[in-house]
C-alpha cells in the first residue's frame, strides 16, 4: 500500500543539511569552466558598465553576466521565448547553481530580461561576440583564410492576416471581402470568403502592405515554401574551423548579394579585432557562396581587395560580349574559381560548415520562429546566439562535447563501445587455438559487424572516432 504524498506545511526554520543539493550537471559545470578560462564575467561586466547608472541610487540592477548566462540556457535548452527561459531557470536547481542563485534567491523574471535587452546597445552585443571570438583564436579555432557566406529564413512574430495597406490603411480581410464581393461572393459568408482567398492568386507586395505590429517584417517564402512574414539571418563562417565570423539579421525582402563585399570585409574586421592585429591586415584569401550571391559589382570589389570569389554563375552560358571588358574579366575569374578543383572543395566545405552553424541556432536553438519583434531586437538575440555557438565550438575543442545532447550521446557511445568490446573478447576466447590468419580475418569481420550493429542501434556517428582508435590498437597487437 502506498502513502499519499502532499506538500507539507511551511516550516519556520530548515537545517542547511536538509536543503536539496543541486544535481550534478557536468555540462553546465564545463560551460562555467570554459567561461572562466577567458575571464568572461569580468570582461562582460566592464563592457556593460556604461549602460548602468553610477550614482548608486535605487535598487541595484541584475548582473549582466546572469543575463547572458540565461540566454545560454535558452540556446542549449532549445527555448526561444524570454518567458520560457525565465521559467526554466527558476525551476532547475542545477541551472540556479550555474547562474549563482541558491534555493532562496529569486531568479530574474522575463520582464527583467526584456528590460536588459533594451538597455544594452547593439555595440555591446557585438563586443561580447568579439570577446568569445577572441577566445576561439587563443585555442587555434580562428584561421580567417577561407570564408563562406549564406542566408536562411526566420519566421517573424507577425501574421499575414494582420497586414494593412500602406496607402488606404485597409485591413487584409476587408480587402479580401471587397474582392470577394466584386466576384459575386457574399462577403458575410466567412467560409466562402476564406475559400476565395485560398484559391485566388496572391499578389501581395511589401511596397503595398505592412504589418502594424512588426513593420520590419517582410512578406517572403519560408524554408517550407509557404508565404509568411520573414527575416533573413546571414552567417559568414571560417571554412577551416567552422567558427562564425560575422552574423546579422537582414530584412526579408533584401537580395542575398546586397552588400556582399561589405559583409565579407566586416568579417575581416572582426578577425583583426579578435586577433588584435592591424586594422588593414587582410587574412581572407577566398570567399565561397552560392549562385544567389553572384553580383558583378560586389565580386569586382572583393577581387580588387585581392579576395578570390568562388561563386557559381546563375546564368548558364552567359554571353560575356554583353558585358564590358572589366565585368567580363570579373565573371570569368569567378567561374574559373568555382569550376576548379580547389573551388569545388571550398564549396563542399561551405555547405558543411554553414548548415552546421544554422541548424544549432535556428532549429536546435529555438530561433527558427522568433518571439521578438523589430530588426534591432532580432539582431541583438541573433548576435548572442552566434556567440554561444562559437562558445560551443570551444567546448568541443576543450572537452569533446559542445551541447547537453552531445554529452548524453557520448556517455551512451562509451557504454555501447564497452559492450562491444566485451562481446568481441568473448568471441576471442571462443576462437583460441585456431589458425592465426583465419582468426584475424574472422575477428575483424566480427568486430566491425558488432560495432556497426551497436552504432545502428544507438548513436549513429558518435562511435566513429572511437572505433577508429580501437581498430588501430587491434592492429598493433596483431590480433
Put a short name on every predicted segment.
Residues 2, 42-69, 73-141:
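Basic, low-complexity intrinsically disordered segments
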Residues 90, 99-101, 108-307, 312-314, ...:
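Polybasic low-complexity intrinsically disordered regions
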Residues 251-257, 344-456, 460-479:
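Basic, amphipathic alpha-helical segments enriched in Lys/Arg and hydrophobic/aromatic residues
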Residues 1-56, 432-435:
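Basic, low-complexity segments
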Residues 188, 296-376, 380, 479:
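Helix-centered, glycine/charged polyanion-binding patches within enzymatic domains
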Residues 17, 21, 118, 122, ...:
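Hydrophobic alpha-helical scaffolding
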Residues 39-43, 50, 78, 236-241, ...:
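Function-dense linear segments that define catalytic or interfacial modules
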Residues 8-12, 47-49, 110-112, 210-212, ...:
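Short acidic (Asp/Glu) and glycine-rich catalytic loops that position anionic groups and cofactors
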Amino acid at each position: 500500500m502506498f502513502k499519499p504524498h502532499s506538500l507539507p506545511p511551511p516550516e519556520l526554520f530548515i537545517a542547511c543539511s536538509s536543503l536539496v543539493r543541486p544535481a550534478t550537471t557536468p555540462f553546465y559545470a564545463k560551460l562555467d569552466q570554459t567561461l572562466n578560462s577567458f575571464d568572461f564575467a569580468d570582461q562582460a561586466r566592464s563592457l556593460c558598465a556604461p549602460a548602468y547608472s553610477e550614482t548608486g541610487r535605487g535598487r541595484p540592477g541584475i548582473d549582466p553576466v546572469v543575463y547572458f548566462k540565461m540566454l545560454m540556457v535558452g540556446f542549449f535548452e532549445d527555448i526561444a521565448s524570454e518567458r520560457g527561459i525565465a521559467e526554466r531557470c527558476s525551476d532547475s536547481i542545477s541551472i540556479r547553481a550555474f547562474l549563482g542563485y541558491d534555493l532562496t534567491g529569486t531568479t530574474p523574471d522575463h520582464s527583467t530580461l526584456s528590460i536588459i535587452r533594451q538597455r544594452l546597445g547593439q555595440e555591446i552585443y557585438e563586443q561580447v561576440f568579439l570577446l568569445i571570438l577572441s577566445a576561439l583564436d587563443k585555442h587555434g579555432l580562428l584561421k580567417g583564410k577561407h570564408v563562406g557566406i549564406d542566408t536562411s529564413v526566420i519566421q517573424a512574430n507577425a501574421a499575414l492576416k494582420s497586414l494593412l495597406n500602406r496607402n488606404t490603411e485597409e485591413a487584409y480581410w476587408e480587402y479580401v471581402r471587397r474582392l470577394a464581393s466584386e466576384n459575386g461572393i457574399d462577403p458575410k459568408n466567412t467560409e466562402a470568403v476564406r475559400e476565395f482567398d485560398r484559391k485566388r492568386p496572391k499578389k501581395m507586395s511589401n511596397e503595398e502592405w505592412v504589418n502594424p505590429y512588426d513593420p520590419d517584417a517582410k512578406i517572403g517564402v519560408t524554408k517550407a515554401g509557404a508565404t509568411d512574414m520573414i527575416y533573413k539571418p546571414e552567417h559568414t563562417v571560417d571554412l577551416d574551423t567552422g567558427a562564425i565570423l560575422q552574423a546579422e539579421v537582414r530584412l526579408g525582402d533584401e537580395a542575398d548579394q546586397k552588400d556582399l563585399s561589405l559583409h565579407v570585409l566586416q568579417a575581416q574586421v572582426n578577425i583583426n579585432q579578435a586577433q588584435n592585429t592591424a586594422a588593414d591586415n587582410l587574412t581572407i584569401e577566398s570567399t565561397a557562396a552560392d549562385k544567389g550571391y553572384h553580383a558583378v559589382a560586389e565580386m569586382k570589389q572583393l577581387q580588387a581587395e585581392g579576395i578570390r570569389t568562388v561563386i557559381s554563375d546563375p546564368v548558364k552560358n552567359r554571353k560575356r560580349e554583353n558585358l564590358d571588358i572589366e565585368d567580363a574579366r570579373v565573371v570569368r575569374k569567378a567561374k574559373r574559381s568555382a569550376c576548379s578543383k580547389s573551388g569545388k572543395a571550398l564549396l563542399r566545405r561551405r555547405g558543411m560548415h554553414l548548415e552546421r552553424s544554422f541548424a544549432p541556432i535556428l532549429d536546435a536553438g529555438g530561433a527558427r520562429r522568433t518571439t521578438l519583434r523589430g530588426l534591432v531586437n532580432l539582431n541583438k538575440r541573433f548576435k548572442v546566439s552566434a556567440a554561444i555557438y562559437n562558445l560551443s565550438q570551444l567546448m568541443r575543442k576543450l572537452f569533446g562535447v559542445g551541447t547537453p545532447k552531445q554529452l548524453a550521446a557520448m556517455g551512451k557511445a562509451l557504454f555501447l563501445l564497452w559492450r562491444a568490446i566485451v562481446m568481441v573478447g568473448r568471441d576471442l576466447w571462443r576462437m583460441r587455438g585456431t589458425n592465426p590468419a583465419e582468426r584475424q580475418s574472422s575477428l575483424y569481420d566480427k568486430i566491425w559487424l558488432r560495432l556497426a550493429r551497436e552504432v545502428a542501434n544507438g548513436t549513429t556517428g558518435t562511435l566513429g572516432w572511437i572505433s577508429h582508435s580501437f581498430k588501430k590498437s587491434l592492429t598493433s597487437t596483431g590480433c
